[in-house]
Design a protein with these regions (language model features):
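Flexible "arm" and connector segments at domain edges
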Residues: 1-75, 79-130
């Protein structure tokens, strides 16, 4: 399957492709939940390394833009590990995404949170904790 076709896959189709890729290489034996989670953390850490110590929002945006290819690669790796974790846990990523969207629409109604943060410790609103 070409890269251009991968861009048009649903998350569930992506999951199936990752599963096939892994099975062809007999890598399932290495894909325990702990190591998959550590893989996600590692990839997030690689993104963190791009922006660490910088506080200025404009500089942060610039460094991310200047390193867009690296950021894209790390985000792709995160999705890869998430697909492996979802496959091993029998979770359909399309369904999981739909559920979280529905949950967050109820949890954060536009009328309550538009242009407001949701950090309860700083006075934000979150219906889950009210």
């Amino acid at each position: 399957m070409s890269i251009s076709l991968l861009n048009k896959l649903s998350m569930n189709q992506f999951q199936k492709r990752i599963k096939q890729f892994s099975e062809e290489r007999d890598w399932g034996q290495f894909h325990n939940p702990k190591d998959l989670l550590l893989g996600i953390v590692e990839e997030i850490g690689e993104i963190r390394n791009i922006v660490k110590w910088e506080q200025d929002i404009d500089k942060l945006r610039k460094v991310l833009n200047d390193n867009k290819e690296k950021l894209e690669d790390e985000i792709g790796d995160i999705y890869w590990f998430l697909a492996l974790l979802a496959n091993g846990s029998d979770i359909n990523m399309d369904e999981a995404i739909d559920k979280v969207i529905i949950k967050n629409q109820s949890r954060f109604p536009v009328s309550d949170v538009k242009s407001q943060h949701t950090n309860l410790y700083l006075g934000g609103k979150d219906k889950q904790y009210q």
